[in-house]
Design a protein with these regions (language model features):
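A sequence-composition feature that detects small, non-aromatic residues
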Residues: 2-4, 26-31, 48, 63, ...
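N-terminal export/targeting and maturation segments
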Residues: 28-81
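Residue-identity detector for threonine
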Residues: 2-4, 8, 35, 58, ...
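Mature extracytoplasmic/lumenal regions of exported proteins
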Residues: 66-161
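Intrinsically disordered, low-complexity segments enriched in polar/charged residues with Gly/Pro
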Residues: 9, 33, 96-99
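Sec-dependent bacterial lipoprotein signal peptides
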Residues: 1-30
């Protein structure tokens, strides 16, 4: 009697069968949605459109308001909108462009002066996570641009005198 895997009673599974099964699983995981390479291409395309850091106005502050790496020491990310104290509005938004595997996200950070509402700067970045073959390993990821994020934005807006 032969099983659906092509083995008969008492025989062991041929290593070639493992290759076929793994290949079928790989093909099945790619069917029905974009691959991680396609999502990476979309991440790169979006980055080219509006990704990166844009500074519209810098603010000079006393040197004692910065740590040894030149980062503002008054930044408190857990305070959300008030993360920069009473004079500035900090906003951070995460948008899910794709929630299925592989996921695609857009991070947008901005800093406004409270007194006049002027946008001082913003950072936009995109990322992909997952899209790999199932397994015990951590999913891969890709993001761009390389230089972006909240801390980098703040070090470009707030400058030590």
């Amino acid at each position: 009697m032969t099983s659906t895997l092509g083995i008969t009673g008492g025989q062991h599974l041929n290593p070639l069968h493992f290759l076929h099964i793994f290949s079928l699983l790989a093909l099945a995981s790619c069917a029905g949605g974009p691959t991680k390479l396609e999502v990476d291409d979309e991440v790169r395309r979006q980055c080219a459109v509006d990704g990166g850091i844009k500074v519209y106005e810098t603010v000079k502050l006393p040197a004692d308001m910065f740590n040894q790496w030149g980062q503002p020491n008054f930044y408190r990310p857990t305070q959300k909108e008030n993360a920069l104290g009473p004079g500035y509005i900090f906003a951070g938004n995460l948008d899910h462009y794709r929630k299925e595997n592989p996921v695609m996200i857009r991070w947008h950070f901005s800093v406004r002066r409270k007194s006049d509402g002027k946008l001082l700067g913003e950072s936009i970045s995109y990322g992909r996570g997952g899209g790999d073959l199932p397994g015990p390993w951590e999913p891969s990821s890709y993001s761009c641009p390389e230089i972006a994020g909240d801390i980098t934005l703040l070090t470009k807006i707030f400058i030590a005198q």
